[in-house]
């Protein structure tokens, strides 16, 4: 009778590591992508794809510095065959991109997910895509139309990606597909529009307007992604912070000096500043300083078990 050898401690750890599921993360070298990879590598083998360098990644994260649309990237994905995929949509990529490139990258990824038989696809979209409006409902659910692209080409591109993934629900029912739409994400490591806006010492505002705002901490968003990766989760989910507050109160808590300006002055000033590359804020985004876009996060709480753990005060302190 052949004796069985009991695995040693290091061998058991090695076997457990080999058994870990592999997750592909796109736009992994963006500021939010870096935070996400540092969280996911504790539980998954992470394959990070981004054309930007990612030199400070965890040692066990595999990084391919290549465009996902290139054959080399597609060959790598087919070889590694990740069972889980996290796609940071254009709203979180932080690079200005042409609409064609944004849509082509997403279409390529969806094809790879289908070809490799990935079990799970999580796409990070944005609640901003609903669009601020003086006539919108107080708290929009996931069934509300995405109307934010009427004033901004960048938002329109992000909506196109969101809609493309929604159609994938029906095209590939074997893949558990999740779309997360977080409110404005802020954090100490982020270089997105909301975080940079809150870091200003002097903040321009629209005279006569004080919209309600919803913020969520970067770590809470990462928690939501981790929950969405669990088996059996699929659908569209708004991701919200613990509460909402007027813009004036948020800026006061940040000790920022507000500079109220009428719209006919602030709009042209932003156009000139953008032309001189002094800001990335587009005049079409002034609507966020005028009207509210509040969303309901009840579905994420009920179906994902998501609850934001960082208070609004902590979120503002951690904005950097």
Spell out what each predicted region is.
Residues 45-55:
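Conserved glycine-rich Rossmann-like NAD(P)H-binding loop of the short-chain dehydrogenase/reductase
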Residues 168-214, 218:
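NAD(P)-dependent short-chain dehydrogenase/reductase
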Residues 150-178:
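Active-site Tyr-X1-5-Lys
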Residues 107-154:
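Conserved Rossmann-fold NAD(P)-dependent oxidoreductase catalytic core, especially the SDR/UDP-sugar
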Residues 65-108, 112, 132:
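NAD(P)H-binding glycine-rich loop region in Rossmannoid oxidoreductase-like domains
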Residues 12-42:
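N-terminal Rossmann NAD(P)H-binding glycine-rich loop of SDR-like oxidoreductase domains
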Residues 222-281, 297, 317-319:
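Mid/C-terminal beta-alpha module of Rossmann-like enzyme folds, strongest
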Residues 2-13, 301-302, 310-320:
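Amphipathic terminal alpha-helices
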């Amino acid at each position: 009778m052949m004796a069985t050898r009991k695995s040693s401690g290091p061998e058991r750890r090695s076997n457990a590591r080999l058994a870990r599921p592999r997750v592909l993360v796109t736009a992994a070298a963006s500021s939010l992508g870096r935070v996400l990879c540092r969280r996911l590598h504790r539980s998954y083998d992470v394959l990070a794809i981004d054309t930007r360098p990612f030199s400070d990644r965890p040692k066990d994260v595999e990084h391919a510095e290549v465009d996902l649309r290139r054959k080399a990237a597609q060959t790598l994905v087919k070889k590694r065959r990740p069972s889980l995929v996290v796609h940071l949509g254009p709203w979180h990529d932080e690079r200005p991109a042409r609409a064609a490139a944004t849509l082509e990258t997403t279409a390529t990824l969806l094809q790879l997910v289908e070809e490799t038989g990935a079990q799970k696809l999580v796409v990070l979209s944005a609640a901003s895509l609903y669009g601020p409006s003086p006539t919108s409902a107080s708290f929009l659910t996931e069934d509300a139309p995405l109307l934010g692209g009427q004033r901004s080409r960048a938002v329109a591109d992000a909506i196109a990606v969101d809609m493309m993934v929604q159609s994938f629900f029906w095209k590939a029912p074997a893949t558990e597909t999740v779309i997360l739409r977080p409110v404005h994400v802020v954090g100490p490591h982020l270089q997105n529009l909301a975080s940079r806006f809150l870091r200003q010492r002097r903040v321009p505002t629209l005279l006569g307007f004080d919209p309600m705002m919803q913020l969520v901490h970067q770590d809470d968003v990462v928690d939501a992604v981790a929950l969405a990766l669990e088996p059996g989760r699929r659908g569209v989910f708004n991701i919200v912070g613990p509460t909402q507050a007027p813009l004036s109160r948020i800026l006061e808590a940040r000790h920022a000096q507000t500079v109220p300006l009428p719209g006919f002055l602030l709009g042209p000033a932003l156009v000139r500043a953008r032309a001189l590359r002094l800001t990335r804020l587009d005049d079409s985004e002034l609507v966020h300083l005028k009207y509210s876009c509040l969303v309901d996060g009840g579905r994420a709480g009920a179906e994902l078990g998501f609850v934001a753990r960082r208070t609004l005060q902590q979120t503002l302190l951690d904005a950097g």
